[in-house]
Amino acid sequence: MKKTEKVKFIINTLEDLYPKVEVPLNHKDPYTLLIAVLLSAQSTDAGVNKITPKLFAIADNPYDMIKMSIDEIREIIRPVGLSPMKSKGIYGLSKILIEKHDGKVPKNLKDLEELPAVGHKTASVVISQAFGIPAFPVDTHIHRLMFRWGLSTGKSVKKTEEDAKRIFPKNLWNKLHIQIIYYGREFCPARGWNFKNDIITQKIGRKSVIKKFLI
């Protein structure tokens, strides 16, 4: 199957399975999305969604957030892990948003990536899902599936993102990256993978991946 045919099959299959998708992290505006995505690093969306209601009930904007101490933030977010780093990041970025951006979340990668504890993936999620700017954030699910589907080498997340942007239509990026995450969780996980249920990998998967499973 040609790569263009693979891409068309992936897009059509994901659209059939997930015609409507939402960001898995609960939020109400760009700031709360930014905080939620930051918290999700090396954690689960479900875990983040359990603690953000308590945090946002106290502070759902940078002005209220810096009224809290780093220790107070840390105590609330402790269950999601990496709380020392994340609490400092939340406090620090909130302060910078007030000082440099009038308390608003910037709409570009450069300014977002200059904020404490905000990496490229986090920034990409924010511009994509908060502002509708085309981006293709790559998480572990997308990185894994792009390799299994033979669409990227799997050498690095950066390479996977470059390949995804080159292969998939730009107007689909914002929805498609979430659809792939949904599919990865449901049909193509890193552990407990049931190849018989994975209709996309069965159809267009990398030969070495399929062969390894069948042996």
Question: What is the role of each PLM region?
Answer:
Residues 2-215:
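Catalytic cores of DNA base-excision repair glycosylases
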